[in-house]
């Protein structure tokens, strides 16, 4: 793929308050948390596996406004679900949440599957990816929500 990122549709996220990060790589997860620190009003929750995120939503009965989801989630357990499998289950347990695939994968088939499964955007990690993520959050961030 020639592009660094592919954006699907980015509807306005009403009252963006809570972002969940599903990323198995601790360094990548911490980079996202640091990046999102630019928005101190947001509540950030992190998960190293998709199953942990799914369980948290089911048990707490609280759905995030936005989930940032990696594709490869198997660095700690090779049997872990991949990001597309997690996206499918998250859409079931949290249908009002929005989902962004934020990953190092740059594969057109996976991009298309993510779109079909309901991801609002597919962003390839890197400087341009963080710029796009910042733009999406900034353009959809409603300070009146607080």
Predicted regions and their residues:
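Non-catalytic signal-transmission and effector/linker regions of two-component phosphorelay proteins
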Residues: 1-20, 25-31, 130-146
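Two-component signal transduction core modules
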Residues: 67, 99, 122-123
């Amino acid at each position: 793929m020639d592009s660094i990122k592919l954006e699907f549709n980015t509807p306005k996220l009403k009252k963006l308050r809570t972002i969940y990060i599903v990323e198995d790589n601790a360094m990548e997860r911490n980079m996202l948390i640091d990046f999102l620190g630019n928005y101190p009003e947001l509540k950030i929750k992190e998960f190293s596996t998709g199953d942990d995120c799914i369980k948290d939503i089911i048990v707490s009965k609280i759905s995030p406004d936005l989930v940032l989801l990696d594709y490869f989630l198997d660095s700690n357990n090779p049997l872990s679900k991949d990001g597309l499998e997690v996206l499918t289950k998250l859409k079931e347990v949290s249908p009002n949440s929005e989902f962004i695939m934020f990953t190092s994968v740059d594969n057109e088939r996976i991009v298309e599957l993510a779109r079909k499964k309901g991801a609002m955007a597919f962003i390839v990690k890197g400087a341009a990816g963080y710029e796009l993520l910042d733009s999406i959050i900034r353009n959809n961030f409603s300070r009146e929500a607080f």
